[in-house]
Amino acid sequence: MGDVEKGKKIFIMKCSQCHTVEKGGKHKTGPNLHGLFGRKTGQAPGYSYTAANKNKGIIWGEDTLMEYLENPKKYIPGTKMIFVGIKKKEERADLIAYLKKATNE
């Protein structure tokens, strides 16, 4: 399991320009991530997803996020997420630990 505090710093630096995590948070360029774990791809209410995201049909969890965050465009070809990914597994684990906590509060 990753480090929540390190993950928060990664989120602020690499994700917060496009995403929010708090309950009731607004969508930005990317969707609000509250309730992410256990939700199917392309399902945040009120956000306009690409068909690729909606049709991927996986459930977000630690394993799926670990793979997705390494290279989003490879994992979901056709996604509009422009983020190149996080190559270091430890950094992805830290970010996932933070997301698991922050998107469930």
Curated annotation (Swiss-Prot):
Entry-linked Pfam families: Cytochrom_C
Residues bearing the modification Phosphotyrosine: Y49, Y98
Predominant place of localization: mitochondrion
PTM entry text: Binds 1 heme c group covalently per subunit. Phosphorylation at Tyr-49 and Tyr-98 both reduce by half the turnover in the reaction with cytochrome c oxidase, down-regulating mitochondrial respiration.
Single GO biological process annotation from the record: apoptotic signaling pathway
Subcellular location: Mitochondrion intermembrane space
Annotated positions of the N6-succinyllysine modification: K56, K73
Residues with the N6-acetyllysine modification: K73, K100
Keyword Transport assigned: yes
Keyword Ribosomal protein carried by entry: no
Residue(s) carrying N-acetylglycine: G2
UniProt GO molecular function: electron transfer activity; heme binding; metal ion binding
Residue positions binding heme c: C15, C18, H19, M81
Keywords of this entry: Acetylation, Apoptosis, Disease variant, Electron transport, Heme, Iron, Metal-binding, Mitochondrion, Phosphoprotein, Respiratory chain, Transport
Domain of life according to the entry: Eukaryota
Protein task: Electron carrier protein. The oxidized form of the cytochrome c heme group can accept an electron from the heme group of the cytochrome c1 subunit of cytochrome reductase. Cytochrome c then transfers this electron to the cytochrome oxidase complex, the final protein carrier in the mitochondrial electron-transport chain. Plays a role in apoptosis. Suppression of the anti-apoptotic members or activation of the pro-apoptotic members of the Bcl-2 family leads to altered mitochondrial membrane permeability resulting in release of cytochrome c into the cytosol. Binding of cytochrome c to Apaf-1 triggers the activation of caspase-9, which then accelerates apoptosis by activating other caspases.
Family, similarity comment: Belongs to the cytochrome c family.
Disease: Thrombocytopenia 4: A form of thrombocytopenia, a hematologic disorder defined by a decrease in the number of platelets in circulating blood, resulting in the potential for increased bleeding and decreased ability for clotting.
Name the UniProt record assigns to this protein: Cytochrome c
Gene: CYCS
